[in-house]
Amino acid sequence: MYIQSRVRLLLPILSFLWIATACTDEAVHVQKELYFPLRSYLQQEIVQLEKHPQSVHKTMILDGKKEVRTIKEIDWEKEWALFIDSDLNKPAFDKSYDNLSEEGFRWYSLKIGEKLPVKKMKIQLDALERPASIEIEMSQTNFLFETKKKLHMNFVDGKIETYSIEGWQKMRWGSPTQYQLLGVLLTK
């Protein structure tokens, strides 16, 4: 009799708990973005450029040899891959950067002792908190090579106007290769 009364008391409690947990939405683990959401911002820009294509006046310099072209169709994901991959909002990076930001300016600097390719990221924001300019410094060194890159993007009204990548790479047993790329989005 004692056990039966305990079961009768326990059954409604267990039923209530089961219903309460069954009716809640599954917890979605969304990582809070600690840094400026560069990847998602650029992907939004790419979507807009795919809807409203723009030509690009592109200047490329490789070891002093210059080439200038106007390109009408461009794969923006590939073109801006270095910028997109520079996004700092990755779970492994959450404690790797000092946040030196102030109002209207985002500045992230790699902490001493960390070994990640993005060393600094500076983002100047306009009055509406959209990027006005982005500057990224990257470098990597290993047994075979050393590489340094500076990436820049300039914006007008939150839309990309120009972008540039300049850098050099030196293989351990070779001479350094220097390169520059400047892209200017042309209005129709």
Q: How would you name each of these model-derived features?
A:
Residues 31-54:
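Post-signal peptide N-terminal segment of mature Sec-exported envelope proteins
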Residues 2-11:
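Bacterial N-terminal signal peptides that target proteins for export
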Residues 46-128:
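Surface-exposed acidic loop/strand-edge motifs in secreted or periplasmic proteins
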Residues 106-188:
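Gly/Pro-enriched, hydrophobic low-complexity segments
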Residues 5-6, 37, 75:
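Poly-acidic low-complexity segments
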Residues 24-27:
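Bacterial signal peptide processing site
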Residues 19-22:
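C-terminal motif of bacterial Sec signal peptides marking the signal peptidase cleavage site
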Residues 14-17:
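Alpha-helical transmembrane segments
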